Amino acid sequence: MSVNGEWMSSDGHYPYTLRYGSAEGDLSSREKRKNTDVQTFRAEAGLYGNFSDKEQWRLKAYYFQSSRGLPKATTFYNDHSTQHLWDKNTFIQSQYKKEFSQQWVFQTSAKWNWSYQRYLDPDTKNSLKKTENSYYQQEYYLSASVLYRLLSNLSFSLSTDGSINTMNADLNNFVQPTRYSWLTAFAGKYVNDWLTISASALATIINEDVKKGGSAGNHRKLTPYVSAAFKPFHNEEFRVRFFYKDIFRLASFNDLYYEEVGNTQLKPEKAKQYNIGLTYNKNVCSFLPYLSATIDAYYNKVTDKIIAYPTKNLAVWSMKNL
């Protein structure tokens, strides 16, 4: 069993020089940044158990909360700033693993996650004289995987993950999205004295529904991965490695549905990743018993990259594809 916690508080009032003009001799003053306070609290607890050498389980609980000011830029010598953000997050997750034999291994895990965020701007020029939004999100997650060792140097695995994500807010006509995700991966690995090869295929099925308005749509995708490591010299620990990965990332609920921030027209971010590398290990002498050198080159081709860009309010950004 393990338990730990952490609390942090900072006023963030760091000093800066405010200049009243750009010409030499213009007045200046020493100021302190305002509305930069941060308070955070985190607590974790874990339980770990072994039913036998081949059967284990784990349980973890987590809680986090924060309160932070959102400072604005000093514009025309006005440093007034009152916007604030509160966050809370908690989850419980468990994992179970059992080796039925040298050939078969089963593993499953489950998780429940809850998060809350509140944003306040008491200086908004509207009929309420403020902007105040609260968002609530939940996730239910379940996964299972099985590993089969066909030979001592050849193994296959099949894993599947399912999750349900929901979001709500105290806003009129909020869309209230629900996302159903199902991911299934089939993988294989072969190892001998001079070659290691791994390959997998990931099938992703995403269905997204909303109670009001428009959703970000449904998605179907099959993405491959392959990697290899080659040892050309029997007596030297020198290896040549490479991998190729085709993957995509969906926009989060925050990216899609947050007030003033979200953009339901966001496309998934797609990436093709390439890597080639060299690794050399050597036992040199008693003074230098172990030497390792690694060099890698990466190439990523990203399309429809999801980025955040500032709006007229520096504390509120918006999302788009690049």
What are these regions (language model features)?
Residues 155-235, 244:
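Signature of Gram-negative outer-membrane beta-barrel scaffolds
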Residues 13-21, 64, 69-78, 118-127, ...:
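Outer-membrane beta-barrel translocator domains and adjoining extracellular loop/strand segments
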